[in-house]
Amino acid sequence: MEITLEDLLKSRDERHAHQMQLLKEHEGLTLVCLTVVMPGSVKRNVQSLVAAHAGVDALRERFAGETVSLEERDLDTGYEAYLLTRLSPLEAKERACEIEETHMLGRLFDIDVMDASGCPLSRSAVGRGARRCLICDGEARYCMRNHSHSLDELQARINSMIDAYVQRI
């Protein structure tokens, strides 16, 4: 199913509201939120689900014994996972960055960490550099902003990454 810009913006607002609600219901905890990087108008497909399930498995493994709750949502606008932990926001962000940087599909994961007041932590808060582009390894935000790579290039790279991952499991 193709997603419009309006759908995407609405889903972001709903995700933010859900994050705030979780933090309100679970006072004092740190929230870890996983989504999948999936360029284009189709956000939910076989590739995004493979990546999402791999990301959730990585969260379960990396936050084992530290997870208060884990909620998963399979939406047309993409898969979302919400993990609540008693870890400090800095420790949670460190673990999230480790997943993004070491997992075979980690560059397809967008793992945000929010403190108890809802403030997101940046990668630089734990001494990490900016996210890298899937194609050229430059800073992803610049390539995205400048449309440095075509949608076909990005989708081909994502498909290649997922195919390699599936062959290994």
Where do the language-model regions lie?
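Short beta-strand-to-loop capping motifs
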Residues: 36-38, 83-89
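Aromatic-anchored, charged helix-turn/loop surface patch used as a conserved interaction hotspot
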Residues: 68-69, 75-86
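Long, contiguous binding/interaction regions
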Residues: 1-66, 74-76, 94-169
